[in-house]
């Protein structure tokens, strides 16, 4: 599994090029690559699983001398089992970010290249959101809940949230695509429905900070009389985005979700240079920002 080359080559495949968390994944990976003397190519799949698959297969099936030593990817849809198999057959390492897959044990047994996953605990992220709801709405209430696309991460976050959400908090489910615009569009469509116009809503929880911001913008533009009496919350919690938005009052809470790309790259490089196989799954911990105990309840009397 070890490489004889002084400089290793890696490919990082990310979901979109305009998301705060995805941009931070690229930034930290490029910084880590520089320190590790790794040539890193970053690809973006434009939120399209077919594009992601085609981009990676094109590299795998290209000239041997141009192939990377390892591929790291945050899957758009499925964890691309056929691409993973093709990569490991070509002796290319395979690292899943923020996802685990049933095929990992089999590929690890058959491959001489490193095969593993580095992931945030997606269910725990959801559980934290449920606790934030309880802190913000101790007497219950009604929220719009903006889920991401129908992929595992979004599903697990929803499952975790439902496990800790208070029974007296009701949800109306909406669907976005992780982008601010998709959060705006989903919320704006809902606000055009009479059922939403007439509803007593206390806020919007979204599965990432950008969708939460998009939802807030929709209320500012379409229901400005309601926005100041509502709470908005998301996930990612980057210092320059979610955390900053909590500090300036645009969000009531977020969840700090550590980046995983630099960890995956570091573990892969160590594996390639030492001939060892990392643990099958490395999990990093998320946390509420601010801490759940410090979240101030929404003042219901503020409703107009």
Regions from the PLM with identified roles:
Residues 52, 115-142, 183-187, 237-242, ...:
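Hydrophobic alpha-helical segments within soluble ligand-binding/sensing domains
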Residues 4-28, 32, 41-57, 75-78, ...:
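Extracytoplasmic "Venus flytrap"
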Residues 6, 164-165, 256-304:
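Hinge/cleft segment of the Venus flytrap/periplasmic-binding protein
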Residues 20-36, 125-129, 152-169, 182-186, ...:
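Short, solvent-exposed amphipathic alpha-helices that sit
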């Amino acid at each position: 599994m070890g490489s004889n080359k002084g400089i290793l080559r890696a490919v990082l495949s990310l979901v979109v090029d305009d998301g705060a968390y995805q941009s931070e994944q690229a930034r930290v990976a490029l910084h880590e690559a520089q320190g590790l003397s790794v040539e890193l190519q970053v690809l973006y799949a434009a939120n399209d699983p077919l594009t992601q698959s085609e981009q990676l297969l094109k590299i795998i099936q290209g000239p041997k001398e141009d192939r990377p030593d390892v591929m790291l990817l945050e899957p758009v849809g499925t964890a691309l089992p056929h691409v993973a198999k093709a990569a490991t057959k070509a002796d290319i390492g395979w690292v899943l970010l923020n996802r685990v897959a049933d095929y990992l044990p089999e590929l690890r047994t058959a491959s001489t290249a490193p095969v593993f996953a580095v992931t945030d605990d997606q269910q725990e992220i959801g559980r934290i959101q449920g606790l934030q709801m309880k802190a913000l709405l101790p007497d219950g209430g009604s929220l719009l809940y903006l889920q991401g696309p129908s992929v595992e991460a979004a599903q697990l976050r929803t499952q975790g949230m439902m496990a800790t959400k208070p029974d007296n908090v009701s949800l109306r489910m909406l669907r976005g695509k992780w982008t601010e615009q998709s959060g705006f569009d989903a919320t704006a469509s809902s606000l055009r429905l009479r059922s939403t116009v007439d509803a007593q809503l206390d806020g919007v929880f979204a599965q990432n900070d950008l969708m939460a911001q998009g939802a807030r913008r929709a209320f500012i533009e379409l229901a400005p009389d309601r926005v100041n009496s509502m709470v908005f919350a998301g996930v990612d919690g980057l210092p320059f985005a979610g955390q900053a938005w909590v500090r300036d009052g645009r969000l009531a809470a977020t969840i700090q979700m550590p980046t995983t790309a630099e960890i995956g790259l570091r573990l892969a490089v160590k594996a390639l240079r030492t001939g060892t196989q990392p643990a099958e799954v490395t999990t990093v911990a998320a946390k509420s920002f601010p801490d759940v105990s410090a979240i101030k309840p929404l003042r219901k009397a503020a409703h107009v």
